[in-house]
UniProtKB/Swiss-Prot annotation:
Pathway: Cofactor biosynthesis; (R)-pantothenate biosynthesis; (R)-pantoate from 3-methyl-2-oxobutanoate: step 1/2. This is 3-methyl-2-oxobutanoate hydroxymethyltransferase. 3-methyl-2-oxobutanoate binds at D50, S51, D89, K119. InterPro entries: Pantoate_hydroxy_MeTrfase (IPR003700), Pyrv/PenolPyrv_kinase-like_dom (IPR015813), Pyrv_kinase-like_dom_sf (IPR040442). GO terms for molecular function: 3-methyl-2-oxobutanoate hydroxymethyltransferase activity; magnesium ion binding. The active site is at E188. The keyword Metal-binding applies. SUPFAM superfamilies: Phosphoenolpyruvate/pyruvate domain. GO terms for cellular component: cytoplasm. Belongs to the PanB family. Mg(2+) binds at D50, D89, E121.
Length: 274
């Protein structure tokens, strides 16, 4: 009889252990079951990001993304993964009004998707919310620096940390949500020296995850479509690890040419009579 091997899915606590052991944390975004299945073996966590609004739906920002959209795609990612921790973004408007609103929506995400954690944007001003959630059994990943849900108040997608006092403010944000119980903090779009100072601060227990920050972070994350060359526009911090857009276009062109010429479908692609 063959032996069934059960893979234990990683949990939030495992990321803290990796930080303590000095092991780099690897993460990517995913929105579909098939891409989630591909990255599952290589990632410690997979983020179902509200960036799906821009990547999947062509939105100008993440602001129109709804909780229902996040739940639907998180369900798909859970079906495609077996090993990686799955973290789901709390979309704009789903947690800011009150701690109670945040808990009800976060609990819904975890119950309806089976995901292992939620992520919310904001620093010290949301520390009480982070504590409220973690005290009630919801693992929380924070997000500081360039927070896309604040694009309108930031005046656009602007790198953080250039101004006087920015390092102190960002460090205070990281400390506050770490002390509130966040197991990890995404640090996005922060100038390198400031990001490095925060990432190497021994008082910050949470694992730091960089995206346009510093190699000193405990781990790194990228949007999968950006690093594969599928996106039209990518930020400076993205390194291209593939050019799938060109390969897809070439395949589609070949298909269209063969259909037009009557070469597809050939005999091998049709069903003969019995």
């Amino acid at each position: 009889m063959s032996q069934v091997v059960h893979t234990r899915r990683l949990q939030a606590v495992d990321l803290i252990k990796r930080k303590a052991e000095g092991r780099k944390i690897i993460a990517l975004t995913a929105y579909h079951a098939h891409t989630a299945n591909i990255v599952d073996s290589y990632c410690d966590f997979v983020l179902v990001g509200d960036s799906l609004g821009m990547v999947m739906h062509g939105m100008e920002s993440t602001l129109p993304v709804t909780l229902e959209m996040m739940i639907l795609q998180a369900q798909a990612v859970m079906r495609g993964t077996a090993r990686a921790l799955v973290v789901v973004d709390m979309p704009f408007g789903s947690y800011e009004a009150s701690r109670e609103q945040a808990f009800l929506n976060a609990a819904r995400v975890l119950k309806e998707t089976g995901a292992g954690a939620v992520k919310l944007e904001g620093g010290a001003r949301f520390a009480e919310t982070v504590a409220f959630l973690t005290e009630r059994g919801v693992p929380v990943m924070g997000h500081i620096g360039l927070t896309p849900q604040s694009v309108n108040t930031m005046g656009g997608f602007k790198v953080q940390g250039h101004g006087a006092g920015d390092e102190d403010r960002l460090r205070a944000d990281a400390r506050a949500i770490s002390e509130a119980g966040a197991f990890a903090i995404v640090m996005e779009g922060i100038v390198e020296p400031v990001a490095r100072a925060i990432a190497t601060d021994p008082s910050i227990r949470a694992a730091t995850i960089g995206i346009g920050a510093t190699a000193a972070c405990d781990g790194q994350i990228l949007v999968l479509e950006d690093m594969l060359g599928l996106s039209d526009r990518v930020p400076k911090f993205v390194k291209s690890y593939g050019s799938l857009r060109a390969h897809i276009e070439e395949a589609v062109r070949a298909y269209a040419d063969e259909v037009q010429a009557g070469r597809f479908p050939a005999d091998g692609h049709t069903y003969p009579p019995r």
